[in-house]
Amino acid sequence: MGRGGRWAVALAAAIVWVGGASCSRNREQSQPFYLRSEVGSQGPEFAKALYQTVSTRMVPGNRLRWANNGAVFDVMEEELSRARSSINIVLFIWRPGQASERILSVVTERARAGVACRVLVDPLGSGPFEKDIKPRLEEAGCQVHIFRPLPADENLARNHRKIIVVDGRVAITGGLAIQDEWLGEARNEKEWRDTNARVEGPVVAQLQQAFAENWQESTGELLPSSDFPALGNSEPSLDEVRDGWGGFVASTASPELTRAERLTQLMVRAARKRLWIAQSYFTPNEPLIALLVEQARAGVDVRVLAPGDKNDHKSITLLQRATYSTLLAAGVRIWEYQPSMMHAKTMLVDDRLVLVGSINYDALSFNLLEEGSLVLEDQEAARGMEAFFLEDLKHAKEVKAR
């Protein structure tokens, strides 16, 4: 069974599993999790709400550059080639092809030059990796491990994070994968549409920590202290200028309530004027649907960009469309991306707050997967996301209520 088939089976099994877990949760709680408190989308109010919700501290002094579609490989090559001390990579998908050859070339060259290279991949997403790619990395001196090895189909708690950290100073994250579908410019179904970010600054230590916890589980090893350079030692004041404040939220499996679900609801709740969502697997659960409905009825400009018929999992398209009538009736506007698979997982909240990462609105991300998303309060980053979201809508078809 190929990757797509195994992933579809995993999602179906997750829905059944989550149904049982939800029943268990409901016996202990009077109702499913629903974030009721209002919260602002910027400044100390949001930063404190984020800390309460997922234990992530917003830190200042970060700079973000968008790296969408095939441009992410240019950014990866550029940053990896600059590595002097360490390269740490955790990915759900790394598969043979042109994209793989580009990254292999840089990583193996750096490893042979003495850079400590650590690679961790998930076997469910990366099928041929262990046979075709792992030996070449190891021959060059890289440490390579498979996260929770096969039979992966018997363990749905997979690693869906997409994190690359170079020298502890620069990180790349988003919906990315090392696979040829990510190389192009989303012009046709062979070139996927995705959103990624390069970030530098103190928040990189939080992405490094997310890698470190997965590496420790797989190897029993800690990263050296040199992988956490001092990028800002002083305790920040929440009253400082807000541009460049960011935090990385790492989520792990739980039968009760994950940080992925908590974070998603917090971002939705924070919106006062607009909430623009790009979501590759849009199958929100009932509490999230209710929250989106509430925000739309309160006058928030709620827009959802999801895949259309080019979705790589047709069964998810059916589940996705089953949510439309309730959302449309409340005033949520929905578009389906037409040229190719739309794989982004982003949120734009009001005028300053953005999210980019690996979290999907589905039963797997909210319950079973290792996930991670970057949250950044930054006006320039928000303007960039606004621009490419509007550009994406030009290539999408708006769904109308029947």
Predicted regions and their residues:
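Intrinsically disordered, low-complexity segments enriched in polar/charged small residues
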Residues: 8-11, 166-167
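Charged, low-complexity intrinsically disordered terminal segments
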Residues: 20-402
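Bacterial N-terminal signal peptides
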Residues: 10-18
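Bacterial N-terminal signal peptides that target proteins for export
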Residues: 1-9
